[in-house]
């Protein structure tokens, strides 16, 4: 499971659309998204309610505690909303140690209310944890002792009986309504492959549940089966995270392929760089470098999997090698081309793209004093490793090659020993 945060606008859009389909609950929520490109006249033509009611506006940037941070404005008319957005759009703010400009807002009708409830649903490998409180809102953390929680195993179904402990202390006149809403929200959670859903708070408007503030995360590995249900969904970067040009290029490649191509720069001046096959293996290699005491020298996190074709691997490897060889300083560097033992991927085929990139970057590799360490197993691995050995001899670049007879992370220790060993 890969939990990806989505904007509040999309969380509410999905809940409203699918709660009607799955539980016959018609939420009366309305919302509009505002960015730098928004034309307020055009937006008002599309959402006529914007000009006829008092409004709430707040950043929709994947961070919480907006109310406590003075970033929520209430009871504004549309002109005041436009002024509020204009004054803050592109302005850098700091939230929990992360700094970034505000780029996206959500605008909604102002809803007067007295009671605030809290609801969250979180999934894990064994089931779902569902929490509810009659004391929701910005002080939820201070009132966490009033939150009721149940755990629903994956093999069990949600029923009113299961939900009963959460709502047992509610007044009778709202108990069934809120119970049905919790069950409906859970149905949406499961059907759309949410991994996290939180409403803090939701209230009752004319006796009907009404989410005021909402957060959501989706399991993006389920995108293939939820394309139509999710619609035009966006997975924004975490607040404060800005992609470099190289990361953005790889992200674009990843979006266009059925394979997985991931690349994150951790330390541009690091001397240990990785290009690892497999999501699990890529984490193990990074953790091993850290466990050996050299996390500060780790230049990147990189992972390719899902049998990318040779051209995709070539473009991917070019970027990794370019970053790994930038600004030579006379000290040795190491590139780990690692992986476990593949089940189906043709190792020789994927190595062809890497070999082409290494051959293209010969001058950069030598200038940066790069030492290359290869470890891989799987279908056709002997051919792939033989080609790697031949490449090392051809280029005159230090290149050590290991197969499945060697431990997967043994090359991490060899790379560290190499770059830390003083020149004779």
From Swiss-Prot:
<dbReference type="GO" id="GO:0005524">
    <property type="term" value="F:ATP binding"/>
</dbReference>
<dbReference type="GO" id="GO:0005829">
    <property type="term" value="C:cytosol"/>
</dbReference>
<comment type="subunit">
    <text>Heterooctamer of 4 alpha and 4 beta chains.</text>
</comment>
<feature type="binding site">
    <location>
        <position position="376"/>
    </location>
    <ligand>
        <name>citrate</name>
    </ligand>
</feature>
<feature type="binding site">
    <location>
        <position position="345"/>
    </location>
    <ligand>
        <name>citrate</name>
    </ligand>
</feature>
<keyword id="KW-0444">Lipid biosynthesis</keyword>
<feature type="binding site">
    <location>
        <position position="343"/>
    </location>
    <ligand>
        <name>citrate</name>
    </ligand>
</feature>
<keyword id="KW-0963">Cytoplasm</keyword>
<dbReference type="GO" id="GO:0006629">
    <property type="term" value="P:lipid metabolic process"/>
</dbReference>
<protein>
    <recommendedName>
        <fullName>ATP-citrate synthase alpha chain protein 3</fullName>
        <ecNumber>2.3.3.8</ecNumber>
    </recommendedName>
</protein>
<keyword id="KW-0067">ATP-binding</keyword>
<dbReference type="InterPro" id="IPR032263">
    <property type="entry name" value="Citrate-bd"/>
</dbReference>
<keyword id="KW-0808">Transferase</keyword>
<keyword id="KW-0012">Acyltransferase</keyword>
<keyword id="KW-0547">Nucleotide-binding</keyword>
<dbReference type="GO" id="GO:0006085">
    <property type="term" value="P:acetyl-CoA biosynthetic process"/>
</dbReference>
<dbReference type="InterPro" id="IPR016102">
    <property type="entry name" value="Succinyl-CoA_synth-like"/>
</dbReference>
<dbReference type="Pfam" id="PF16114">
    <property type="entry name" value="Citrate_bind"/>
</dbReference>
<dbReference type="GO" id="GO:0003878">
    <property type="term" value="F:ATP citrate synthase activity"/>
</dbReference>
<keyword id="KW-0443">Lipid metabolism</keyword>
<dbReference type="Pfam" id="PF24948">
    <property type="entry name" value="Citrate_synth_N"/>
</dbReference>
<comment type="function">
    <text>ATP citrate-lyase is the primary enzyme responsible for the synthesis of cytosolic acetyl-CoA, used for the elongation of fatty acids and biosynthesis of isoprenoids, flavonoids and malonated derivatives. May supply substrate to the cytosolic acetyl-CoA carboxylase, which generates the malonyl-CoA used for the synthesis of a multitude of compounds, including very long chain fatty acids and flavonoids. Required for normal growth and development and elongation of C18 fatty acids to C20 to C24 fatty acids in seeds.</text>
</comment>
<dbReference type="GO" id="GO:0005576">
    <property type="term" value="C:extracellular region"/>
</dbReference>
<comment type="similarity">
    <text>Belongs to the succinate/malate CoA ligase beta subunit family.</text>
</comment>
<dbReference type="InterPro" id="IPR056749">
    <property type="entry name" value="Citrate_synth_N"/>
</dbReference>
């Amino acid at each position: 499971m890969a939990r990806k945060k989505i904007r509040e606008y999309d969380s509410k859009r999905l809940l409203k659309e699918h709660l009607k389909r799955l539980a016959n609950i018609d939420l009366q929520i309305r919302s509009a998204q505002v960015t730098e490109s928004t034309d307020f006249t055009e937006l008002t033509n599309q959402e006529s309610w914007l000009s006829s009611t008092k409004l709430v506006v707040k950043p929709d940037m994947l961070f919480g505690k907006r109310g406590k941070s003075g970033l929520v404005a209430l009871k504004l008319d549309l002109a005041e909303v436009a002024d509020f957005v204009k004054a803050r759009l592109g302005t850098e703010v700091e939230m929990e140690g992360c700094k970034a400009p505000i780029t996206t807002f959500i605008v909604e009708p102002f809803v007067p209310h007295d009671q605030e409830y809290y609801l969250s649903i979180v999934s894990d490998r064994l089931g779902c944890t569902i929490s509810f409180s009659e004391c929701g809102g910005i002080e939820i953390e201070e009132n966490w002792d009033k939150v009721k929680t149940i755990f629903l195993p994956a093999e069990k179904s949600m029923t009113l009986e299961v939900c009963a402990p959460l709502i047992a202390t509610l007044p009778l006149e709202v108990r069934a309504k809120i119970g049905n809403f919790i069950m409906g929200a859970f149905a949406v959670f499961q059907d759309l492959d949410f991994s996290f859903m939180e409403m803090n708070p939701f209230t009752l408007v004319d006796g009907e549940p009404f989410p005021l503030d909402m957060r959501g995360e989706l399991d993006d590995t389920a995108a293939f089966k939820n394309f139509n249900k999710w619609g035009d969904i966006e997975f924004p970067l975490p607040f404060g995270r800005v992609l470099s040009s190289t990361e953005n290029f790889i992200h674009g490649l990843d979006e266009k392929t059925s394979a997985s191509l991931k690349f994150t720069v951790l330390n541009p001046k690091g001397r240990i760089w990785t290009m690892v096959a497999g999501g699990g293996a890529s984490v193990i290699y990074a953790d091993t470098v850290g466990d050996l005491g050299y996390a500060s020298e780790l230049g990147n996190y990189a992972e390719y999997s899902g049998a990318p074709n040779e051209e995709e691997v070539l473009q991917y490897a070019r970027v990794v090698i370019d970053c790994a060889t930038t600004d030579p300083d006379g000290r040795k560097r190491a590139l780990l081309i690692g992986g476990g033992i593949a089940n189906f991927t043709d190792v020789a085929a994927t190595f062809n793209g890497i070999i082409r990139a290494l051959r293209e970057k010969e001058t950069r590799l030598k200038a940066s004093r790069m030492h290359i360490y290869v470890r891989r197993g799987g279908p056709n691995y002997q051919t792939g490793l033989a080609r790697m050995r031949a490449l090392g001899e051809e280029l005159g670049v230090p290149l050590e090659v290991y197969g499945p007879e060697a431990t997967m992370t043994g090359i991490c220790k060899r790379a560290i020993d190499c770059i830390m060993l003083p020149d004779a």
